[in-house]
Amino acid sequence: MQFTHKKNRSLYIPYAGPVLLEFPLLNKGSAFSLEERSNFNLLGLLPEVVETIEEQAERAWIQYQGFKTEIDKHIYLRNIQDTNETLFYRLIGNHLEEMMPVIYTPTVGAACERFSEIYRRARGVFISYQNRHNLDDILQNVPNHNVKVIVVTDGERILGLGDQGIGGMGIPIGKLSLYTTCGGISPAYTLPIVLDVGTNNQQLLDDPLYMGWRHPRITDDEYYQFVDDVIQAIKARWPDVLLQFEDFAQKNAMPLLNRYRNEICSFNDDIQGTAAVTVGTLIAASRGAGSQLSEQKIVFLGAGSAGCGIAEQIIAQIVREGVSEEEARQRVFMVDRFGLLTDGMPNLLPFQNKLVQKREHLQGWDTTNDVLSLLDVVRNVKPNILIGVSGQPGLFTEEIIREMHKHCPRPIVMPLSNPTSRVEATPQNILSWTDGEALVATGSPFAPVTLKGKQYAIAQCNNSYIFPGIGLGVIASGASRVTDEMLMAASETLAKHSPLVNNGEGPVLPELKDIQTVSRAIAFAVGKVAQEQGVAVKTSAEALLQAISDNFWLPEYRNYRRTSI
């Protein structure tokens, strides 16, 4: 199919001179043409040679290679982003496999921990509780008039690192970089926001460099009222925006999602995005083994909002494959620090209640313990799939993995906790303990493992396979909501792009070099379901594909023409 493109048209720019060079979305640096240098008062402000973006990217790549630590590389890339965003995305696109772990997990974790120390330049919006009476003014100060995607955090549960206060801003910045890199969403349409509601991290409160509000976190009614005020202000400024909740604490994540998912186009990536990519991976892994997800028994370590969100999405997929909901729930076992979730346990959270196992079904289990540990569960359930979302390293022990492998010749093991320092077990250990027979997918990137002369690719079950395509699909279709069915469509589409499924061998997930193709396909599937469900205006398939193409931004310089403000 041939698409028409509008991206070769000139841009009319009201800025000139040093102001233009300081505008990251518009700055071309040494790539301004001689005509543009004359028209925009740039003569003498740049070296003589007019370069192409590829020449600029090659210089930046050479400079990047001169940095020895991942955090220094991260700082360097962020400086380019804050100087020339088009060059930043061209550079990332040229070296995606190398740089994605640097701009996001795992390196972004260290960047969040050291946010106030390595701070260079403002990016995004910092909304402090102290300024709660000035929300409209704060959002009016944002120069982007056509914001289409916002990622917002309150910094309380950053990856597996806990409360990082305003340091959590590193996550929305990094996440939106992936919306652009993987999903083609123009950086001009994106906005990172951190809600500064204080911090309970004493190390930050004692740090003289900490740039956030030095106050214990506000809670309960004060907190929820503040979040509501912010969201109402966002709705007033950008009524059609897609709002992604990111790294909120377990106690707040699900209530906020349930409160706002039908009020504003929104989703929680930790709960729904993680669930969608995990289900897509499991569908592909099951099909690659010649079976269906409905034939598997699944054990979770970690029963927080993310783990339970994944479990509910798995159950929905099992039901789609023809199994009753009651039977589907009997195939999913949730283990937390208090053991297997069972009926009658005290202090269960609302979202955990439907995921408990009935004690009467466990009467014949081989155990003498009142608290059923992960090892007890693995020994008695004999699962095909083991998923870790605990945030605690090393909990998938050799004994547990070997016990699983004893009853399952091709176990699927997914230690998903981020960053790498929090992973439940390393791929190297899992493969060693299973004689190379496990199928391993992780949340953070790991290098291929060589065992007995054979190399094993490690699939990264990363949300970046899902959320950029969802964002692109929402924008292209004009969807007003993100529904469960749209998320399921994303999972199915990801599974269809699995090399293991399509070729009978290879990794369970597509290579990163193919991620834009996957994102476009997910965008189409998501947009189509949105239209079918009535949350987007129905169009032809051709029109939806054209809208996806029109909205897919590429890091290329456009010609500038000068205009007055």
UniProtKB/Swiss-Prot annotation:
HAMAP family with a match to the protein in the record: NAD_malic_enz
Database matches in InterPro entries: Aminoacid_DH-like_N_sf (IPR046346), Malic_enzyme_CS (IPR015884), Malic_N_dom (IPR012301), Malic_N_dom_sf (IPR037062), Malic_NAD-bd (IPR012302), Malic_OxRdtase (IPR001891), NAD(P)-bd_dom_sf (IPR036291), NAD_malic_enz_proteobac (IPR023667)
Positions with a binding annotation for NAD(+): R157, D270, N418
Similarity section: Belongs to the malic enzymes family.
Quaternary context: Homotetramer.
Coiled coil: none
Species: Klebsiella pneumoniae (strain 342)
Full protein name: NAD-dependent malic enzyme
One Pfam family named in its UniProt record: malic
GO molecular function, one term: metal ion binding
Keyword NAD annotated: yes
Gene3D superfamilies referenced in this protein's UniProt entry, alphabetically: Malic enzyme, N-terminal domain, NAD(P)-binding Rossmann-like Domain
GO BP: any one term: malate metabolic process
Catalyzed reactions per annotation: (S)-malate + NAD(+) = pyruvate + CO2 + NADH; oxaloacetate + H(+) = pyruvate + CO2
Cellular component, GO annotation: cytosol
Site positions for Important for activity: D270
Membrane-spanning intervals of the chain: none
Enzyme nomenclature, EC number: 1.1.1.38
Catalytic residues (UniProt): Y104 (proton donor), K175 (proton acceptor)
Designated gene of the protein: maeA
The keyword Transmembrane helix belongs to this UniProt entry's keyword annotation: no
Reported cofactor(s): Mg(2+); Mn(2+)
Cofactor note: Divalent metal cations. Prefers magnesium or manganese.
Binding annotation for a divalent metal cation: E246, D247, D270
SUPFAM superfamilies, per database record: Aminoacid dehydrogenase-like, N-terminal domain, NAD(P)-binding Rossmann-fold domains
Keywords: Metal-binding, NAD, Oxidoreductase
Domain of life: Bacteria
